[in-house]
UniProtKB/Swiss-Prot annotation:
PROSITE patterns: COMPLEX1_49K. It is a peripheral membrane protein. It catalyses: a quinone + NADH + 5 H(+)(in) = a quinol + NAD(+) + 4 H(+)(out). PANTHER family: NADH DEHYDROGENASE [UBIQUINONE] IRON-SULFUR PROTEIN 2, MITOCHONDRIAL, NADH-UBIQUINONE OXIDOREDUCTASE 49 KDA SUBUNIT. NDH-1 is composed of 14 different subunits. Subunits NuoB, C, D, E, F, and G constitute the peripheral sector of the complex. It comes from Stenotrophomonas maltophilia (strain R551-3). Keywords: Cell inner membrane, Cell membrane, Membrane, NAD, Quinone, Translocase, Transport, Ubiquinone. This is NADH-quinone oxidoreductase subunit D 1. One of its GO terms (molecular function) is NAD binding. The lineage of its organism: Bacteria, Pseudomonadati, Pseudomonadota, Gammaproteobacteria, Lysobacterales. Pfam families: Complex1_49kDa. Belongs to the complex I 49 kDa subunit family.
């Protein structure tokens, strides 16, 4: 029985004893409620069978008006908004915003605070890459890697919690330094119905000393943990079949689309703000920039693995310096930094400064600046304009994921539907920063 129909739904007209049929591509939605969408990505795919003809990313589902919110509050009350942009790379976002404010104020954080920022930027980089490799492997069917990666993420998020009290949205960086000195005692697990006896002692074994002791112990063990990830993935036949030659981005395409970070370095372009435009104390530590050759999903994976090794190396150097060089972590300037609790409770002028600072903030001289950091996903920048008031006149945020997502249509064409998932994973997109 012939069931061919026209676009209108009725039977196709007869011509020379045959029915006319119209063959057209199939349009389907990937996301926004899809585990491989990495957030609220809605990808409208035009398919020719299993082959992608066109990909149309729809953005805006996580738009929260962050830039406008930051313009409605004093400078020092908007740092928390930055954490919620790329919510996997929290402190790097803070760093860009804080650097922009410091540039307009004409101040510089103490050296110790800059080393702490450098160390936590790299802890954040490892957190991000662990999430990317774990979830990317899970998207392609390798579940074990995710469990391994989250084992290390748990330890690093404990470092976040030790300095700020929060596991994710830290608000630890402040104009003029950081919120507080590194704690002398690493918090320990307490006995509970889930953690008792031998397990509790094992978990607390590395927590007997300070935070620096805990981080140093982590840097000694982490290279072996990376070896475990590589054992599971790097030479895995199925992993290579799903990633080698998939989503190839040429150096020319990467630069034309404004790609940064691993997306650019994976294509063979050795551009890294930590080397080209050093900030914090990156010019005082020794590290290398991993660069790919093929520009495919597999090279981007290898770059992230190599970057974790380099981040571990930077963290170890920062720990050694911080041990040997005590000092202030915040400027002693009550116009931009709050007085200590002891000073506030013993000196009336310090109390006034404290109240004014947290109620109305401070006036930032009129001017404009752009401050950027090498975030785990690429160049995260903050363009800040001040008109001399206590609130920004304009805040514009450069999210690396937005430029990367813009290129998806060009790069994904001609690939199979299953390859789209692999490419989204190595693009490392988070919609908090894309939609802002």
């Amino acid at each position: 029985m012939n069931t061919e129909r026209t676009m209108a739904g009725g039977p196709a007209p007869m011509r020379d004893g045959r029915r006319d049929t119209e063959i057209r591509n199939y349009v389907m939605n990937l996301g926004p409620q899809h585990p491989a969408a990495h957030g609220v990505l809605r990808l409208v795919l035009e398919m020719d069978g299993e082959t992608v003809v066109r990909a149309d990313p729809h953005v805006g589902l996580l738009h929260r008006g962050t830039e406008k919110l930051a313009e409605s509050k004093p400078f020092n009350q908007s740092i928390g908004y930055m954490d919620r942009l790329d919510y996997v790379s929290m402190m790097c976002n803070e760093h860009a915003y804080v650097r922009a404010i410091e540039t307009l104020l004409g101040i510089e954080a103490p050296i110790r605070a800059q080393y702490i920022r450098t160390m936590f930027d790299e802890i954040t980089r490892i957190l991000n890459h662990l999430m990317n490799i774990g979830t990317g492997a899970l998207d392609l069917g390798a579940m074990a890697v995710m469990l391994y990666a989250f084992r290390e993420r748990e330890e690093l998020m404990d470092c976040y919690e030790a300095v700020s009290g929060a596991r994710m949205h830290a608000t630890y960086y402040r104009p003029g330094g950081v919120y507080r000195e590194l704690p002398e005692q690493m918090p320990k697990y307490k006995e509970s119905r889930w953690k008792t006896g031998k397990q509790l002692r094992r978990l607390n074994a590395a927590r007997e000393g300070s935070l620096l002791d805990f981080i140093e112990n982590f840097t000694r063990e982490f290279p072996n943990r990376i070896d475990e990830y590589e054992t599971l993935l790097t030479d895995n036949r199925i992993w290579k079949q799903r990633t080698v030659g998939i989503g190839v981005v040429s150096p020319q395409q990467a630069m034309e689309w404004g790609m940064t970070g691993v997306m650019l370095r994976g294509s063979g372009v050795a551009w890294d703000l930590r080397k080209k435009r050093p900030y914090a104390k990156y010019d005082a530590v020794d590290f290398d920039i991993p660069v790919g050759t093929a520009g495919d999903c597999y090279d981007r994976y290898l770059c992230r693995v190599a970057e974790m090794r380099q981040s571990n190396r930077i963290i170890r150097q920062c720990v050694d310096w911080l041990r040997a060089n005590p000092g202030p972590v915040m400027l002693h300037n009550f116009k931009v930094a709050p007085p200590s609790r002891q000073e506030m409770k013993s000196d009336m002028e310090a109390l006034i400064h404290h109240f004014k600072l947290f109620s109305e903030g401070y006036q930032v001289p009129a001017g404009e600046t752009y401050a950027a950091v090498e975030a785990p996903k690429g160049e995260f920048g903050c363009y800040l304009i001040s008109d001399g008031a206590n609130k920004p006149f304009r805040v514009h945020l450069r999210a690396p994921g937005f430029a990367h997502l813009s290129s998806l249509d060009e790069i994904v064409r001609g690939h199979m539907l299953a390859d789209v998932v692999a490419m989204i994973g190595t693009y490392d997109i988070v919609f908090g920063e894309v939609d802002r």
